[in-house]
Amino acid sequence: MRNSDTLVIDLEKEYKVLSTAGCPKIYKDVRYIVFRRVPKDFEYVDLDGYCKDTAKSVGIDYEKSTIFLTAVDVREYGHATHIFRDVIAEVYVTFGVDKPSCIDANIPSNAMAVGTINVAVIVNKPLDEVGLLDLYRLVSEVKGLAMGLAGPMCLTAPSIGTASDATMVAAPQGGERFGGIATDVGFTAAVATLKALSKFVVGTNCIEYFVNSVGLRSIDDILKIAVKAYNKAPIPMLSSGEVEKILRREFEDVFKDPNICIVVRGARLAEMLMALNLFPGISEEEYRVDTPKIIADELIGKAIAEYVNGFKGLLAYYWIERLKEEGVFEELENLPPMTDDIVAAVVGSVLSRVYDKYLNSH
């Protein structure tokens, strides 16, 4: 059964399950997996009662079901299968991330950001309870890895998921007590999980990917900075409203090039390592105060600006940097040390393209 609100998966036989879904099942025998769509502001005190009603509404046994809750259209789920030797792993994912939760003691409010990533993994390899727990650990690690490397980022810290993520692993009851990455079942489940999660990354357009990578809410955040800079050197007869539309088109054109997103993502991953004190030779404190010993941010900004519009792009990047030092952009002042150079370079180089096109045509 599948519609926009409910996806029911019949495993056709019972599996031993370890699940932290909305209505969890801990080492229970389960035949049905349900993904149920709920409102984003969903607050239900009696979750067991809600799940029992859900199971009844779709004609399945609640005691033999594990029920995930999500705010996304469940028809947009991810699915993948991987086979290695004699092991088959099948994975179902729903992905709803308005904003990720982050590892940063300085921004505890982000820990309660809205979003849910549900991951259900089914393997044909019989496992005992310890093996199932080991497999659960591995799947959680893989999901965190995928989010940290490719998912949305917070402004000053990486993410490993959201505040309400849920995971389920299912296997026939057996005697195998190992399910880690060095086992056939663990390796197979890990690959299948990455395949299922990848749908939600590769399906992202480059603008959205850029915004997610630098921890902003939307392209409008960058447009606001660009328009503010334009107002410092306006073109006669071209209003702020008109230039905003032109800039939006230019940003869309620039972000069609995946090379920009490759450079930006790489820089942000390095920045996250420094923010977590995981980068050799650079302490967290040095990173936080933007120590002069780190010049990678300027090198990256220079590379982006020149790539987008050559020497004119570079000059415009330096112009944005000077305006930033004068206190024109409070938005840039709140960005991390490397991210502010990334945004300044993108804004400056795109603005320089607008000046080029408009002034050369008039």
Question: Can you say where each PLM-predicted feature lies in the sequence?
Answer:
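Alpha/propeptide regions of enzymes that mature by internal proteolysis
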Residues: 1-206
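Long, hydrophobic, amphipathic alpha-helical segments used as structural scaffolds
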Residues: 147-154, 201-204, 230, 234, ...
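Extended, non-membrane alpha-helical segments enriched in charged/polar residues
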Residues: 220, 224, 228-232, 249-256, ...
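Glycine-rich, aromatic-bearing surface loops/beta-hairpins
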Residues: 315-362
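Long, charge-patterned amphipathic interaction tracts in eukaryotic proteins
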Residues: 244-318
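Aliphatic-rich, non-membrane protein domains
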Residues: 228-229, 271-275, 283, 325, ...
